[in-house]
């Protein structure tokens, strides 16, 4: 398991400096709950964190009221921040300004679209606009949104109803779908899309084959999070609300995108160009801005949902017999107030990388359409490198936001503390062997493939005049893929949030796992024996 193996096998106990907290000593419960028998060896809570934020309670983790079974405390009492403040406020303000800019651009674009509605058309066929995407494209995007919403919602419910079979079904269907659509595109001689989808399909088939041995552990963790979500908090309600917001914003983005083309695309028969306000550079610049804004807002929404759900699962882990009555509401409030800037900052880093990847993919598709295989290969390599960078930043984000959800620290400090804990505890071994993150990415890709295929078929059968030479096929498919992928990611966020929070919480205080969740701990040891080295036998 890489560094974690060296850590385990070296036989050296982590040496800590002075001034760290005392080992948490659990108080006997006041009700009839019987604690498991005392283990012969007790692993101390992680001594270098998490930060106490001025509370001075001295424990290895924050909740101080978690074991009084006769009284339910609130989330804010159990995860108290003594001196709360708005962290990384500049990033939150910048997000608001970017969103305001999106609103302004959208208003201008929609005003132009409305003023030229007769030219843009009011249906799928017989539109006068033959120089840019028009009302027919808007209708296409509405179909894409509907498909993305329905498939994403069904995918989450499949995970809820069949957690054990979920991983197998996702992997097999995704590989078959990717390769099948690739063959279809190649048959249609749409070489750029066919080659890309074929490469992805074969790569995913290889990955899934290498993951088979890790499926039992992953299935156990998925089943655990699903079971918790059915009993505590409002996990699926948060997922549904987030999905609705993501779908509505994507619809807004899609209409704005078409409006920019209608208002600013230079063409002799474009009535909007009568005052000389059109220009290809203006179209490219505005589309780049709204696409970046869409990436950032979508990431912020996804991470806000993740942080909210992390508060729910953190409450369950530390207080299974005294679950706070307002966990979901209070966690969401903290994510939208004190942690708003921190979530915006982490989301900004990912949005920048995603935006660069989108530019790279557009350039790659253009090179493929022009028949330049050298340029196509170069942009493929750059896209892969950006993909690796995006994965690394998202990995850090996911676990840092679990820390932020419970302890309210600033982004960079939380990321640093959490990363150090993960490496010192060897939690990275559990994370690497849990497939839920990749499986959910597979599911999101499946939905994105479906949306892209729908866009291709729509353009093929309707044959709009503006796409007579196929010049907009790659653009429309790319944005359809993007919309489907982002909506699916928002819907599935709560599923992975639970597992990630359990891993982080187990790293901060492993004692809680085998003391308050003995059945889960024993089952984890059965399917993945190395858990003992991470959670107890250190």
From Swiss-Prot:
Signal peptide: none annotated. Keywords: Cell membrane, Glycoprotein, Membrane, Transmembrane, Transmembrane helix, Transport. One of its GO terms (molecular function) is transmembrane transporter activity. Residues 1-88, 159-165, 213-239, 302-335, 394-434, 496-538 are cytoplasmic. Residues 110-137, 187-191, 261-280, 357-372, 456-474 are extracellular. The chain crosses the membrane at residues 89-109, 138-158, 166-186, 192-212, 240-260, 281-301, 336-356, 373-393, 435-455, 475-495. Residues 1-54 have a biased composition (Low complexity). It is a multi-pass membrane protein. It is found in: Cell membrane. GO terms for cellular component: plasma membrane. Glycans are attached at residue 134. The keyword Ribonucleoprotein does not apply. The keyword Membrane applies. InterPro entries: Choline_transptr-like (IPR007603). Residues 1-67 are annotated as: Disordered. Probably involved in transport through the plasma membrane. Belongs to the CTL (choline transporter-like) family. This is Protein PNS1.
């Amino acid at each position: 398991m890489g560094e974690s193996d060296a850590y385990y096998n070296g036989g050296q106990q982590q040496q800590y400096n002075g001034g760290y907290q005392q080992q948490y000593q659990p108080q006997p419960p006041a009700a009839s709950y019987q604690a498991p028998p005392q283990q012969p060896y007790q692993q101390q809570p992680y001594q270098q964190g998490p930060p106490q934020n001025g509370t001075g309670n001295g424990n290895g983790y924050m909740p101080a009221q978690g074991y009084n079974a006769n009284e339910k405390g609130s989330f804010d009492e159990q995860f108290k921040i003594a001196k709360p403040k708005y962290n990384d406020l500049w990033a939150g303000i910048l997000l608001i300004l970017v969103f305001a800019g999106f609103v302004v651009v959208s208003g201008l674009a929609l005003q132009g679209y409305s003023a030229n509605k007769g030219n843009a058309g009011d249906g799928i066929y017989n539109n006068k606009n033959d120089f840019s995407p028009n009302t027919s494209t808007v209708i296409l995007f509405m179909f894409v949104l509907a498909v993305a919403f329905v498939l994403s919602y069904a995918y989450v419910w499949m995970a809820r109803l069949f957690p054990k079979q979920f991983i197998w079904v996702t992997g097999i269907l995704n590989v078959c779908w990717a390769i099948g659509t690739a063959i279809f595109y190649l048959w249609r001689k749409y070489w750029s899309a066919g080659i890309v989808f074929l490469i992805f399909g074969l790569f995913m088939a290889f990955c899934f084959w290498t993951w088979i041995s890790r499926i039992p552990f992953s299935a156990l963790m998925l089943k655990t999070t699903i079971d918790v979500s059915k009993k505590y908090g409002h996990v699926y309600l948060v997922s549904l609300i987030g999905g609705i917001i993501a779908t509505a914003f994507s619809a807004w983005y899609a209409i704005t995108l078409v409006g920019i083309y209608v208002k600013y695309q230079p063409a002799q028969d474009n009535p909007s160009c009568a005052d000389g306000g059109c220009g290809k550079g203006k179209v490219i610049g505005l589309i780049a801005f709204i696409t970046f804004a869409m990436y950032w807002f979508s990431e912020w929404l996804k991470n806000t949902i993740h942080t909210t759900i992390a508060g729910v699962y953190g409450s369950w882990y530390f207080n299974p017999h005294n679950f706070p009555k307002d966990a979901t509401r209070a966690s969401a409030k903290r994510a939208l107030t004190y942690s708003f800037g921190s979530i915006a900052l982490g989301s900004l880093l990912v949005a920048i990388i995603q935006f660069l990847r989108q530019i790279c993919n557009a350039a790659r598709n253009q090179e493929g359409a022009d028949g330049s295989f050298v340029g196509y290969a170069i942009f493929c390599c750059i896209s892969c490198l950006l993909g690796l960078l995006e994965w690394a930043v998202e990995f850090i984000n996911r676990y840092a936001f679990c820390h932020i959800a419970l302890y309210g620290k600033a982004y960079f400090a939380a990321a640093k503390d959490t990363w150090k804990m993960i490496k010192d505890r060897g939690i990275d071994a559990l994370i690497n062997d849990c497939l839920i993150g990749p499986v959910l990415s597979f599911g999101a890709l499946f939905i994105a493939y479906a949306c892209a295929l729908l866009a291709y078929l729509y353009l093929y059968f309707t044959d709009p005049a503006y796409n007579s030479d196929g010049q907009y096929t790659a653009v429309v498919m790319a944005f359809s893929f993007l919309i489907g992928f982002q909506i699916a990611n928002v819907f599935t966020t709560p599923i992975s949030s639970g597992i990630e929070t359990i891993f982080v919480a187990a790293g901060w205080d492993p004692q809680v796992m085998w003391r308050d969740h003995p059945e889960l701990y024993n089952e984890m040891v059965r399917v993945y024996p190395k858990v003992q080295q991470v959670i107890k036998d250190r």
